[in-house]
Structures are given as structure tokens and as C-alpha cells.
């Protein structure tokens, strides 16, 4: 499967992790293995690798959401969460976080199309950022508490 740290398809294990960080503290809270769709469809291969029959393919964003929900059920409060474009490019993930009233800052692919709450399409990120002047960029404060 694709191994991001190696930059190529490789024999590797891919995991999804949930981490918690403050200026003074950081730790991994939870993690789960990602089983590629090709593996999930090949049950004899899974059995040979010791993967139980009940383990099925789940997209990484769904695994991340399950880890998040479990942490929240255990009383962990996240003021903000961040993620890379592998998750930010999945509208289902963004909608699920919004439905949970979770604040987030995420990377999105340059081909991502942004939209408004009423379904209005703004622009693809690539074209929107190309049109923006250097003076239009600013740091946005993210202070406040959701917990």
C-alpha cells in the first residue's frame, strides 16, 4: 500500500492516530490500523495475515472520526483539531466535525472546492489563493474555549 513516509508503494502498516497537544503537554490518545480496500476484498490474504473476518475496510477519515468520538465519550475535550489534506479533502469528514460543533483548522488539496452554508460554491482553493494578494493574507486569532 502507499507509504507516505517512504513516498511510494511499500510493504508497511498504516495507522490513524489521535493526538492531544497543549503548549506544556502532548500525547497520543488512540490509534487504529487502516486496512486498504484491496486487502479487505481479499479475505484469504487477510486470514493468512491474521486479520479477523469482521475487520473491514473503513476510510481513514471514518477511523479518525471514530477515534474522536471515543475520546469525547471518555471526557476528552478538544478546543481545536487539525489535520492534513488526506482528511481535509473529504467533505463528509468536514461536515461530521461541523455537526459535532467541533472547531477545526485543516489542510485541503489545491483542487478542493469551497462552499457556503447554503450550497454556494466559492472557488477552488488553487484559484482563490492565486487571486489573493500578499496583503490579503493575515493571521486569524483562534483563542477561546469550546470546553
Q: For each predicted feature, which ranges?
A:
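A short local loop/turn or secondary-structure capping micro-motif enriched for an aromatic residue
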Residues: 36-40
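An internal, acidic/charged active-site-proximal segment
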Residues: 41-147
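Active-site-proximal, Lys/Arg-enriched surface segment
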Residues: 1-35
Amino acid at each position: 500500500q502507499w507509504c507516505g513516509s517512504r513516498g511510494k508503494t511499500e510493504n508497511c502498516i498504516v495507522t490513524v492516530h489521535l493526538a492531544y497537544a497543549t503548549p506544556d503537554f502532548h500525547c497520543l490518545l488512540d490509534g487504529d490500523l487502516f486496512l486498504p480496500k484491496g486487502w479487505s476484498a481479499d479475505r484469504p490474504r487477510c486470514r493468512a495475515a491474521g486479520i479477523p473476518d469482521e475487520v473491514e475496510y473503513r476510510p481513514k477519515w471514518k477511523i479518525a472520526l471514530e477515534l474522536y468520538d471515543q475520546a469525547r465519550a471518555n471526557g476528552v475535550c478538544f478546543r481545536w483539531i487539525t489535520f492534513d489534506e488526506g482528511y481535509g479533502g473529504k467533505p463528509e469528514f468536514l461536515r461530521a466535525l461541523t455537526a459535532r460543533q467541533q472547531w477545526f483548522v485543516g489542510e485541503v488539496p489545491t483542487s478542493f472546492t469551497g462552499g457556503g452554508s447554503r450550497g454556494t460554491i466559492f472557488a477552488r482553493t488553487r484559484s482563490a489563493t492565486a487571486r489573493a494578494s500578499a496583503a490579503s493574507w493575515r493571521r486569524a486569532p483562534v483563542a477561546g474555549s469550546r470546553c
